[in-house]
Amino acid sequence: WILLLGLRHLRPTVFTAANSALDAGGVVGEHKFQALAPLQHNAPDLAAVCTRIAAGDGPLRHTAALRFAEVHGYPVVLKPDIGQRGRGVFIARNAAAVHDYLARFNGAVIAQQYIDGDEFGIFIARMPDQPQVQVLSIVHKTFPQVTGDGQRSLQQLILDDARARLIADTLFARWAEDLQRVPDSGESIALVEIGAHCRGSLFLDATARVTPALVATLTRLADAVPGYAFGRLDLRAPSIEHLQRGDGLRVLELNGVTAESAHIYHPGTPLLVGYAAMFRQWALAFRVGAARARDGAPVTGPVELLRRFVTDLARARQWF
């Protein structure tokens, strides 16, 4: 389908022009901080405060991360500046965890303020002549949790939970030191804290929750990042009601062209419905990219895209 669209538009990678705010349109290998920096400068009320810590293995990295945590408090989110699908994302709750993370990963890192609340992924698109963004998809990311009964261990609670046992190996590694602990009766334990489907989050379709107030806030957000016109915003809000009012939103990441309209992962969504959504998304990506290319946005060529994919495969070995 992508090849067909490329032939139709006579430029196979014109979709990369949809997001000049990100390297190669955010297809692969983009720097997350490239879009987060202008957002927190131009619309600080919509951003989770973050800073970029340069690659290396010297003590200055540790000092910078600890200083950030001292100012903004724990927990602090640490993640690769270049990364995808939640790989390498870690929530550090103390200085020892910060030191351990930086010792294991010496690439460029983003330290970000931890934002509590409900997490959402909102896919937006905008043609050059549109005054407001259009919302293609909203997904409500929920995190599996178990409740203790005073009898079963955490390991058994995980195995007895229909959702949690599907990712038991991941959860066992995450909770290795607590698996034999018996939670108190009524004690609730959030097993996952990172909003990535591959990390165990459950994605629920919330597209019907879109409101004019939300669209207005998302438009202001897009205006704060020049060149950002097509992609998924991962953000948190105090509640879904706050989201609908466009109130209290804090962006965690701005993803590019290859991000997915994640509502397709809603449990029970037919496969053909998911494919249809992705076909529509890619058709729109080409239209937005072509329109912005005509306005002068840069297009990344096929050879450069291939190089980026190869580099990304090698980079993935560093993540944990």
Question: Model regions: which residues?
Answer:
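Short beta-turn/strand-loop junction motif enriched in small, turn-promoting residues
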Residues: 107, 127, 223, 238-242
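Active-site nucleotide/adenylate-binding loops and adjacent lid/helix of ATP-dependent enzymes
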Residues: 21, 31-173, 211-215
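Coil-to-beta-strand transition motifs
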Residues: 117-119, 128-134, 227-230, 244-249, ...
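A short acidic, glycine-rich active-site loop
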Residues: 24-27
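A short glycine-rich, hydrophobically flanked beta-strand micro-motif that places a catalytic Asp/Glu
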Residues: 113, 121-123, 228-242
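C-terminal active-site "lid" helix and adjoining low-complexity regulatory extension at the edge
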Residues: 238-320
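ATP-dependent carboxylate/phosphate-activation module, predominantly the ATP-grasp catalytic core
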Residues: 125-225, 255-256, 260-285
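A transmembrane-helix-recognition feature enriched in membrane-embedded lipid enzymes
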Residues: 1-20
